[in-house]
Curated annotation (Swiss-Prot):
Pfam families: TELO2_ARM (PF25320), Telomere_reg-2 (PF10193). This is Telomere length regulation protein TEL2 homolog. Disulfide bonds: none annotated. PANTHER family: TELOMERE LENGTH REGULATION PROTEIN TEL2 FAMILY MEMBER (PTHR15830), TELOMERE LENGTH REGULATION PROTEIN TEL2 HOMOLOG (PTHR15830:SF10). Belongs to the TEL2 family. Residues 455-501, 629-648 are annotated as: Disordered. The lineage of its organism: Eukaryota, Metazoa, Chordata, Craniata, Vertebrata.
Length: 835
């Protein structure tokens, strides 16, 4: 009896739909078409009695999707002629007023099966209206409700998830150049984020009414969209909206926790990374994630391992958010201590330092300093032994680095570590030039907000540390003093209105006179008179250039004295003046001086500073020798033999220099000559010999010969790799300046052999110098000579460059290797392109 009654109740719906489809498939009258559609429209929407509700549910469950597919299939030129604008609105309403999930699937599937036609245009129009009216929120909400059922249709939900997450890609493939703006990723994903917020708002209202809800499908949508690389478009709208909602509402806070917790593990990484990058601070990150880092092993791995140790692209704000989030709750602080120990181990490792690039080391240093700033005294005390061990080994490794930026970074971190270990002691202190990076590193010790767990340690005495209370008093006092000064000034006479004489450029007069002879300078350099020494060092380089013949007599002796003289802090710019004097001597008498310097470079009992000074002098002297001589007559040829006159000749200014009479005559002739057309005048280059070419071998070959000889106090292939790196760069400079020199090919062959021996050096600074040397050889030695005299070396070098460009851990090494490969290819093409 009950079964037959059920059949009678269900039969009318299926019969009506079947008859309507049969009639619509062969209809030719527009009015009748509208009547048939209206007869089926009654099954959409809510009904008043239970019978109509059952019919409505039956239609939605069994007949809605097939009927929509039939409507799409029938849409063509014939139906378009029968349907007016009002009738087309009725056709659209079947998609816009029925179950949103089924309508969305039918529209998306129809787009994939339909080519350019009226049917495609109509489906696109309906889908555009579907999105603009916010129906995506209804799709997500209906799927969320279906997941509460005992037997949810997982295949259907997976299909809807794929269509929602990749809708812009599907529409771009279907419409190509005729795509609509609403389907663009930059417009669609913010719209999707708004729909997710609407769904969460419905869930919030339902929870307040005591209803059971699920948001797992919304989490899946967020996860899959982020997995496809659209975190920025989605989360840039979703995260700020959630931030404003979770501030004072505990229900919204729990919804946010569940939203992130329900993301599948395979999509958790892009979601967490996107939230960390978008989160405005640690407090909001804690409100959004809760204790997810403790509950979910995947999230814990991401936040405590991968994002801190395996990646280095996060900005410092994101790092502060991650570590600050771990410090905000007692249940998570043990992870912060664990991270600190692991960071100390990584930072102090010599292997990590050698095989990591500067951005990676900067990332580790930032994480370490942020952790130090977030830990309290008790936690620091528990890690004190680890801090001491890491400080000792790490500081030594960083100080041995040949890269100045890395060495400076290690000094900053070592200083901060020592001060945190013993806040009352003196701590470590290094001398280095502060730049923006060092200031940023030091600022990381102070968290952006004072957290509850370590407030007692971060701020010892707010009244003393805060300048806000003392500033108003100081400002008021300065104002009173300014008023008093102004009143006293008004009482003075009018003579004080005159502008004071500018004495900013005045210099202090020295009692000692500048020496006039080179030998007098040597005596002063050997004495202990600081004032005479300062005067002598100021004019020594100029005096050497003015008295070349006298300088050549004592060039080696003067070089020896300047090389061994101790730094004089009391003499202003002493290091710069000493370097200028050494360069002037080397330029004046290059062969003996270069032989002495290159010989002393490998001698005993020289400090690293002296050896590096030798390299600087050689490179600067080679640069000066390769430049053209001035067209002015030399000071020594103008001198009459008196010392005072030679001194005067070296201090001529440009205005006092005698004018070139030929140039004056040519200008007068040009001014009195009338020309109807005149091109741009180009001065004729004056040929001049390159003084460096004649002495290049004396600077280059002695320096490259004994690099593998180990001395008790000097080991280039061992611990003194900083000097080795500087020497390699100096050799590259000497090679580059030898362009067009007869000896360039011999220098290039020797330098290629030198590079081949050291190509696998562990220090990145040395490898950078070797790659620089390769480029200088390619630029200085003609390609024909390279392929004739050293073809085998060039081929081996090319394969090595390709390997470095692909596998080297240092970014600069890879860049230099690519430059070398491009240069080789360009030189080869130039040769092949010539007739």
């Amino acid at each position: 009896m009950d079964a037959s009654q059920a059949d009678r109740k269900v039969a009318p719906v299926s019969a009506v739909v079947k008859n309507a489809i049969c009639e619509l498939s062969r209809i030719n009258d527009g009015e009748r078409l509208m009547e048939v559609l209206l007869s089926l429209k009654c099954y959409l929407g809510t009904r008043e009695n239970s019978t109509q509700t059952q019919e409505h549910a039956e239609f939605n469950r069994n007949h809605y999707t097939p009927f929509l597919e039939f409507l799409v299939a029938q849409m063509g030129p014939q139906w378009l002629d029968l349907l007016t604008l009002e009738k087309l609105e009725l056709w659209d309403s079947f998609f816009l007023e029925g179950p949103a999930d089924q309508a969305f699937l039918v529209l998306m599937d129809s787009l994939g099966k339909t080519g350019p036609s009226i049917r495609l245009d109509r489906c696109v129009h309906v889908l555009e209206r579907f999105l603009q009216r916010g129906a995506l929120a209804e799709v997500i909400r209906e799927v969320c409700q279906q997941q509460l059922e005992s037997n949810p249709t997982a295949v259907l939900h997976e299909a809807i998830l794929g269509r929602i997450s990749s809708l812009p890609d599907h529409l771009a493939n279907c419409l190509q150049q005729h795509n609509k703006p609403v389907f663009y990723p930059n417009n669609y994903y913010p719209l999707l984020a708004g729909s997710i917020i609407s769904v969460l708002q419905m869930v919030s209202d339902a929870l307040r009414d005591g209803k059971n809800c699920s948001i797992s499908f919304a989490s899946q949508v967020v996860g899959k969209v982020c997995m496809q690389g659209r975190q920025k478009e989605l989360l840039s709208v979703l995260v700020p909206r959630l931030k404003s909602l979770v501030q004072s509402d505990c229900i919204w806070q729990r919804i946010c926790w569940r939203l992130v917790e329900s993301v599948p593990d395979r999509w958790m990484e892009p979601v967490v990374i996107g939230i960390v990058q978008m989160a405005p601070g640690a407090e909001f990150l804690s409100q959004l994630l809760g204790d997810l880092v403790v509950k979910n092993k995947r999230t814990q791995f991401l936040l405590t391992k991968k994002m801190l140790f395996l990646q280095y692209g996060l900005k410092k704000d994101a790092l502060q958010s991650i570590l600050g989030y771990l410090s905000l709750d007692a249940s998570r602080r043990y992870l912060l201590v664990k991270i600190l120990r692991e960071l100390l181990e990584v930072w102090s490792s010599g292997s990590v330092l050698k095989n990591s690039s500067q951005p990676q080391l900067l990332h580790v240093s930032r994480c370490l300093l942020i952790c130090l700033g977030l830990l309290n005294k008790q936690e620091i005390e528990s890690c004190k032994q680890d801090l001491l061990v890491s400080l000792t080994s790490g500081a030594r490794n960083y100080l041995d680095s040949s890269v100045p930026a890395i060495r400076r970074m290690g000094m900053v971190v070592a200083e901060c570590l020592s001060h945190r270990i013993d806040t009352e002691g003196p701590g470590l202190s290094f001398q280095y030039e502060e730049d923006e990076d060092t200031r940023d590193l030091k600022a990381l010790l102070k968290p952006p907000h004072v957290f509850e767990a370590d407030s007692a340690d971060c701020v010892k005495n707010p009244e003393e540390s805060s300048p806000s209370k003392s500033c108003p008093k100081a400002i008021e006092k300065s104002k009173m003093e300014a008023k008093a000064d102004q009143a006293s000034d008004s009482e003075l006479d009018s003579d004080d209105d005159l502008a004071p004489y500018d004495m900013s450029a005045d210099t202090e007069l020295k009692k000692s006179k500048a020496p006039a002879y080179i030998r007098d300078c040597i005596e002063v350099l050997l004495s202990d008179d600081v004032e005479k020494l300062e005067v002598t060092m100021t004019c020594l380089a100029t005096l050497i250039q003015a008295n070349t013949s006298a300088t050549k007599e004592v060039s080696v002796e003067l070089t020896k004295i300047l090389l061994h003289i101790d730094d004089k802090p009391s003499v202003e710019r002493f290091t710069e003046l000493r370097h200028a004097a050494l360069v002037a001597v080397a330029v004046t008498d290059p062969v003996p001086v270069s032989q002495y310097l290159t010989g002393e470079f490998y001698s005993l009992n020289y400090s690293l500073r002296q050896r590096m000074d030798i390299l600087d002098v050689l490179s600067s002297a080679a640069q000066s020798l390769s430049e053209k001589l001035s067209h002015e007559v030399s000071s020594e040829s103008r001198s009459t033999g008196t010392g005072q006159h030679s001194i005067r000749s070296t201090t001529w200014t440009l205005a006092e220099a005698p004018a070139d009479w030929r140039k004056v005559v040519e200008e007068r002739i040009a001014s009195k000559t009338r020309r109807f057309s005149k091109g741009q005048s180009v001065p004729t280059p004056v040929p001049a010999p390159n003084r460096y070419h004649a002495v290049a071998g004396h600077l280059f070959f002695p320096l490259i010969q004994n690099y593998d000889r180990q001395i008790v106090t000097f080991d280039l292939l061992g611990e003194d790799r900083l000097v080795l790196g500087r020497m390699v760069h100096t050799l590259g400079i000497l090679m580059h300046l030898a362009l067009h020199a007869p000896i360039a090919s011999q220098m290039g062959k020797a330098l290629l052999e030198f590079v081949w021996v050291l190509r696998f050096h562990i220090d990145a600074f040395v490898r950078q110098g070797l790659l620089f040397c390769i480029s200088t050889v390619l630029l200085s030695v003609p390609w024909e000579r390279l392929m004739t005299d050293m073809a085998e070396e060039v081929m081996e070098t090319q394969s090595w460059l390709a390997d470095v460009a692909e596998r080297d851990s240092d970014d600069d090494c890879r860049r230099l290797a690519l430059n070398g490969l491009f240069l080789m290819e360009k030189l080869r093409n130039n040769i092949h392109g010539t007739p």
